UniProtKB/Swiss-Prot annotation:
It comes from Mycoplasma pneumoniae (strain ATCC 29342 / M129 / Subtype 1) (Mycoplasmoides pneumoniae). Its main location: membrane. A lipid is attached at residue 30 (N-palmitoyl cysteine). Residues 1-29 form the signal peptide. It is a lipid-anchor. This is Uncharacterized lipoprotein MG348 homolog. Residues 237-258 have a biased composition (Polar residues).
Length: 305
């Protein structure tokens, strides 16, 4: 054991890596986490042309590398988005509507309007800032969140139907999209722990109303500085005044996670910039929806003006 710790110290492995080793993250492998071609690229052109999510081009980097933060994609400067078209707030973030019937092909929500606004905005980055998205779409007519469960029914409840007893506390969905969503969300929770503490609203897991917010949209902005350090910044769509999740502001010196098992360090919130609605020449309510997201991105990346 002493020899093992001695070898670890000589290699200067970070404390966060030791935590990952202890939790088994480095050694674990979910079926979807190490797959390439899972996330899709969302560009300004795709938003303007209202390209359907299923037709967006796929990125060949694995979920694991993208979640850890990698310079192999766009030199480490990208925004990772994970959503589900089952919760009203996330539908609004994608489409600007709370209606499940509205498809992401319109991209009229906070995400799409901001993607259009940041085109060429961060000129200090040679390749700019790119957006990657993975979106859960329930193939069933009644669309439930992947973490939604059936109500808890006591086995000795004489008034309950047997089917309700059999389904008690079971997951409502086990389709491919739901399984993939749960794996990705759980992996992000495990890697970044405290930065995504309130991602799942446990009080709504057993809700019987379709569209109830069970999870939040996950938005992680990765940035590489001139020391080849990549840091992870978390956006909270429900809290415009405190968009970045708490965490260390000391990024890891990691040239893109090439062979590294250390995820990008969560970064502390930076001061927000404010902009007037008239600055963008679009409808006031649309700008008001996206301005918080733009402020968040400006706190991570250097704006053009």
């Amino acid at each position: 054991m002493k020899k093992w710790f001695s070898s670890i110290s000589k290699k200067k492995v970070s404390f966060s890596t030791l935590l990952l080793l202890g939790s088994g993250i480095v050694l674990s492998s979910c079926s979807n986490i190490d797959k390439p071609n899972v996330f899709r690229t969302l560009s300004q052109q795709s938003v303007e042309n209202k390209v359907d999510y299923s037709k967006l081009p796929k990125e060949n980097k694995t979920v694991r590398n993208l979640v850890f933060g990698t310079a192999e994609y766009n030199d480490g400067n990208y925004v990772l988005v994970v959503t589900t078209e089952t919760d009203s707030s996330q539908i609004n973030f994608l489409n600007g509507s709370n209606n499940q019937a509205v498809s992401t092909e319109n991209w009229a929500g906070d995400l799409g309007t901001t993607v259009k606004q940041v085109q060429n905005r961060y000129s200090t980055y040679p390749k700019g800032v790119k957006f990657l998205i993975w979106n859960d779409i329930d193939p069933n007519p009644v669309k439930w969140n992947p973490f939604a469960r059936y109500p808890v029914i006591a086995s000795d409840n004489e008034l309950a139907k047997q089917t309700d007893k059999d389904n008690s506390d079971k997951l409502r969905r086990n389709d491919e999209s739901a399984i993939q969503y749960r794996e990705i969300v759980t992996f992000i929770q495990t890697v970044y722990s405290g930065s995504v503490n309130n991602l799942i609203n446990q009080s709504n897991v057993h809700a019987q109303t379709v569209g109830t917010d069970v999870t939040k949209a996950i938005v992680i902005a990765f940035r590489k500085n001139n020391l080849d350090q990549i840091s992870a910044h978390f956006y909270n769509p429900d809290n415009s005044n405190g968009s970045n999740a708490p965490g260390s502001n000391q990024p890891n010196q990691d040239s893109g996670n090439n062979g590294s098992t250390t995820p990008a360090a969560p970064a502390a919130a930076a001061a927000k910039k404010s902009y007037s609605a008239g600055s963008f020449g679009v409808k006031r309510h649309a700008v008001q929806v996206s301005i918080n997201f733009l402020n968040f991105l400006d706190s991570v990346y250097t704006p053009l003006n």
